């Protein structure tokens, strides 16, 4: 009510309304297209354009652009952040929203063009020069060649690119620039006119070998994505201490593509003049494990971290007092290619080399420690167990009748008549004139592989993920016991490649009973999700079974990852390879997940029809038996 009395706040709000939103590109919010709404469609387009199936689509982060700003922008904030499209080996980074044109279809077409462009981008291009001028010119040359390649490979994109170039020409701002910057801008406009099939009267320009002092890069063109090369870093020797999940995970943030950089004190400014305000100087207290001086909300802290260009990360021991969710996509660690010596070792697939890393993962197999009390189920869950058992009893094999046997309880009349006719015709009769009945052979072996990584300690809809998994596992195990299928239950978690723990809840030759129920109740959240090694171990155990049909049913709540190099595309490619190896050995692989965002990577891992997404966690105990009946039938 009396906010107008705060002169500084009032003037600040008025100033922000006046010139706070003065971006280089115009924005048309009424015609905006959101990436989250069309990401699945764009993923299909990327695969259709020949892109690798394991490459993921993520929102690009708005980063500070160093191009020359107009007067109003310099007066407002002194910088401009742009969500420029980028690509690396594992990710397509697209703007979270495109509202560049006053036509929604054009904004959508820009997304499609970016996906087609990135599908043919040269991933082995040399790094751009350090000099700003030469970097601009090299980027324009790469863009020209890539546009030509995309239009030649996909002729249907050419009319779309023509319309986009004409629209970009109309929207690109005209700003006062230095002479050399004007020449680079003229080169950009010339390329856009060529794309739009417009006459171009620009003369060729000879550029110097280096840009002069004061040269600033050109304003990026949204049509031409950049290539991000991120070098691997040396493996860390220390162990990460996982942080237990709380009931509130906080708001979801976009994946932030980042670089690991070590600060070198020799590069610090050693000027004797203190020109900075003292509150901007980095204080030691910021890096010391002490109580924070204010009660800022974790949600606000997450939002503030999301807006930072530089975020200082450190390692600490012990459990922090508070945390927030922040998906930071750091470049992977270098792969340690040394061989491991252990009782059970499995290879790992390195997609970059196109070869296996032999004896790369050590699996520690052990039984689950039993708990004194079984899992306590409420009345609804107990009713579900009884209902599932009745449904699965129908699937129990009946007795099959064998005809023309040497011995049996009844005569096979057809065989008796046939034998008497043979004798009457002067032939030899047969003694196989009896009927025998026996139980039908149960020809299915199934392994339930359950992810018990740290993420299962999270709470969704006021229920812990692991508790719901236990309930679903207990319901399904009762059903499988009722139908008589041979079944084993394994859990897995990991902490680097030397410690992949696979525990046995139930073995194939073990009957379901109180002991197994106690083991299910004893399941606890572990660490990380090295899915490939666990799947290879489960496949090896299934391959030893004599049954003709084999099924590996994976229950997980997230995508594969570990604390070392096993993350991002490396983890996806290895897990996909492990699923392919299992199918090549005659093992059917099917995944069930409760991760609501898993639709982005599950098709790449298990293929079409190889997975099921249970969006509502509470429905997992009902959905899992239904999925099993479909697969077993």
UniProtKB/Swiss-Prot annotation:
Q: Which Gene3D superfamilies match?
A: von Willebrand factor, type A domain (3.40.50.410)
Q: Which spans does this entry mark as compositional bias, Basic and acidic residues?
A: 232-243, 258-270, 292-306
- Which Pfam families does the UniProt record give? VWA (PF00092)
Keyword line: Virulence
- Region (Disordered) location: 232-270, 290-314
| Residue ranges of every copy of the VWFA domain listed in the record | 445-631
Domain of life of the source: Bacteria
Mind telling me which CDD domains this protein's record contains? vWA_norD_type (cd01454)
Q: What residue ranges are annotated as transmembrane? A: none
The protein's job, in short, is:
Part of the operon norEFCBQD encoding nitric oxide reductase. Essential virulence factor, probably involved in the detoxification of nitric oxide (NO) produced in the macrophages during the innate response against infection.
Protein name, per record: Protein NorD
Q: Which organism is it from?
A: Brucella suis biovar 1 (strain 1330)
């Amino acid at each position: 009510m009396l906010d107008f009395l705060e002169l500084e706040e009032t003037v600040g709000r008025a100033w922000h309304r006046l010139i706070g939103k003065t971006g280089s590109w115009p924005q048309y919010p009424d015609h905006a297209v959101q990436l989250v709404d069309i990401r699945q469609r764009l993923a299909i387009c990327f695969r259709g354009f020949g892109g690798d199936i394991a490459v993921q689509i993520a929102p690009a982060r708005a980063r500070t652009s160093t191009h020359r700003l107009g007067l109003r922008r310099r007066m407002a904030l002194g910088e401009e952040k742009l969500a420029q499209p980028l690509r690396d080996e594992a990710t397509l980074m697209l703007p979270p929203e495109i509202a560049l044109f006053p036509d929604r279809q054009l904004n959508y077409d820009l997304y499609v063009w970016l996906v087609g462009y990135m599908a043919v981008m040269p991933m082995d291009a040399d790094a751009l020069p350090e000099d700003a001028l030469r970097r601009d010119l090299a980027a324009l040359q790469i863009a020209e060649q890539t546009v030509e390649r995309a239009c030649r490979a996909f002729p249907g994109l050419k009319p779309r690119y023509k319309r986009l170039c004409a629209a970009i020409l109309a929207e690109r701002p005209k700003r006062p620039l230095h002479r050399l910057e004007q020449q680079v801008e003229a080169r950009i406009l010339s390329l856009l006119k060529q794309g739009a099939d417009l006459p171009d009267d620009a003369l060729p320009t000879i550029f110097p070998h280096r840009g002069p002092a004061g040269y600033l890069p050109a304003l990026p063109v949204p049509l031409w994505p950049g290539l991000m090369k991120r070098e691997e870093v040396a493996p860390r020797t220390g162990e990460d201490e996982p942080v237990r999940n709380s009931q509130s995970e906080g708001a979801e943030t976009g994946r932030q593509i980042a670089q690991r950089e070590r600060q070198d004190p020799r590069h610090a400014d050693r000027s004797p003049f203190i020109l900075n305000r003292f509150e901007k100087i980095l204080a030691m207290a910021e890096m010391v494990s002490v109580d924070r001086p204010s009660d800022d909300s974790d949600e606000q802290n997450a939002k503030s971290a999301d807006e930072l260009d530089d975020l200082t990360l450190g390692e600490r021991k012990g459990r922090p007092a508070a945390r927030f969710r922040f998906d930071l996509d750091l470049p992977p660690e270098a792969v340690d290619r040394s061989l491991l010596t252990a009782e059970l070792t499995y290879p790992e697939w390195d997609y970059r080399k196109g070869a296996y890393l032999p004896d790369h993962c050590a699996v520690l197999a052990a039984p689950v420690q039993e708990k004194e009390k079984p899992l306590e189920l409420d009345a609804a869950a107990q009713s579900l167990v009884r209902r599932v058992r009745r449904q699965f009893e129908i699937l129990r094999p009946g007795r099959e009748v064998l005809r023309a046997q040497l011995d049996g309880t009844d005569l096979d009349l057809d065989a008796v008549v046939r034998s008497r006719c043979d004798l009457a015709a002067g032939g030899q009769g047969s003694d196989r004139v009896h009927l025998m009945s026996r139980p039908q052979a149960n020809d299915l072996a199934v392994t339930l592989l359950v992810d018990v990584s740290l993420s299962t300690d999270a709470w969704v809809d006021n229920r812990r993920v692991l508790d719901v998994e236990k309930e679903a596992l207990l319901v399904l195990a009762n059903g499988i016991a009722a139908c008589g299928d041979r079944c084993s239950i394994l859990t897995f978690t990991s902490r680097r490649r030397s410690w992949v723990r696979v525990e046995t809840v139930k073995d194939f030759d073990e009957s379901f009973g109180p002991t197994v129920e106690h083991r299910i109740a004893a399941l606890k959240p572990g660490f990380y999700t090295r899915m490939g090694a666990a799947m290879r171990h489960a496949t090896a155990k299934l391959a030893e079974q004599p049954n003709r049909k084999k099924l590996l049913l994976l229950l997980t709540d997230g995508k594969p990852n570990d604390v070392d190099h096993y993350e991002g595309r490396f983890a996806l490619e290895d897990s996909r390879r492990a699923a392919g190896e299992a199918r090549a050995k005659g093992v059917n692989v099917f995944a069930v997940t409760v991760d609501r965002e898993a639709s982005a990577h599950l098709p790449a891992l298990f293929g079409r029809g190889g997975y099921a997404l249970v969006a509502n966690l509470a429905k997992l105990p009902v959905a899992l038996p239904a999925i099993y009946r479909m697969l077993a039938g």
